[in-house]
């Protein structure tokens, strides 16, 4: 997101930058926790590109060993949460699952999220954590990439951007 914004959305320059970035990746773990473990616990690599919460947890677990460098532009990642109706019905947990989902967006749960280094989605609660989160960061969303369907088509379909970067 940063490089694309910096370079005026020039796709060729963005691809060059991303290829160069991936060329420097020692280990491409399958998930955020694995990448953090590889970097923090195994000492592999010079830089960890991570979720905010992973960076904050690393600082808490290993004080004075790392520095968080916050970009001016990043992606607001909003993982989906849903009740899987058929599964909940089969296990008799529909009301419990729905209650959890409703609670997840309550002020109390949003504060718990912030206390555990997750960026609250409610603006008023996020403001309470202004000392923790950079509130001036330009956060792009999936909509800036044309929505999920378009982003998947442009970046993750066979032969598209990710394949071009990763396989060359």
Residue ranges and their predicted role:
Residues 1-2, 98:
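Residues on a specific face of well-ordered alpha-helices
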Residues 2-71:
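Ligand-binding pocket segment of bilobal, Venus flytrap-like solute-binding proteins
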Residues 34-38, 83-85, 118-121:
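N-terminal low-complexity, Ser/Thr/acidic repeat segments characteristic of secreted
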Residues 53-56, 73-76, 87-89, 118:
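Solvent-exposed loop/turn segments at secondary-structure junctions
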Residues 60-62, 73, 129-134:
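A generic structural signal for short, solvent-exposed coil/turn residues
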Residues 77-81:
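Small-molecule pocket liners
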Residues 88-168:
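Extracellular/periplasmic juxtamembrane helices and adjacent flexible linkers that interface
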């Amino acid at each position: 997101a940063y490089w694309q914004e910096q370079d005026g959305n020039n796709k060729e320059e963005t691809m060059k930058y991303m290829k160069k970035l991936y060329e420097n990746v020692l280990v491409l773990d399958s998930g955020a926790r694995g990448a953090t473990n590889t970097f923090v616990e195994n000492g592999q690599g010079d830089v960890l590109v991570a979720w905010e919460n992973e960076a904050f947890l690393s600082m808490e677990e290993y004080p004075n060993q790392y520095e968080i460098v916050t970009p001016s532009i990043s992606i607001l990642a909003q993982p989906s949460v849903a009740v899987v109706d058929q599964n909940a019905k089969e296990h008799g947990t529909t009301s419990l699952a729905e209650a959890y989902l409703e609670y997840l967006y309550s002020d109390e749960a949003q504060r718990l999220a912030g206390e555990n280094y997750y960026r609250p989605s409610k603006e008023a609660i996020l403001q309470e954590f202004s000392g923790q989160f950079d509130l001036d960061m330009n956060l792009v969303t999936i909509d800036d990439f044309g929505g999920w369907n378009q982003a998947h088509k442009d970046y993750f379909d066979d032969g598209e951007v990710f394949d071009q970067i990763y396989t060359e």
